[in-house]
Amino acid sequence: MSLNKNQFLDNFQNILSAQFTGTQNWWTKSLFHFTDIKNAISIIENGKIYSRNKVIELNLMQNDNANDSVILNTNNEYKNYVRLYFGPSTPTQKNNEGIKPKDKIFQNAHCPIPIMFVFDFKKIFLLQNIRFTDGN
């Protein structure tokens, strides 16, 4: 029996939900994008979250949150998409967030004041032209 997209998403959410318990369970109904407050202001002003390549092209990035080696090792095609996460707390976020002295910033990865954007899981996954990766 083949599943339509809605059925597939319901099954996928149930699988995710089984991995999160208690107060974390609501995460499975959302997708997350974090960035520094300076970039968040630009996102709100423009009403859009652009891909890494597009934000560089439009000169909109106020603060580059990313680790240089992660970006260097990310396929350029993936930089044409907005990076969203299944949970609001990722190793990347934990390593990069917070106001830090320069000697504590590793490979330019710094997100002094993180802002989290939260999106409806199903609405995003029902959009055309979305992609999944299992990492960077």
Language-model segments: residues:
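Active-site-proximal loop/hinge segments that shape catalytic or ion-binding/gating pockets
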Residues: 2-136
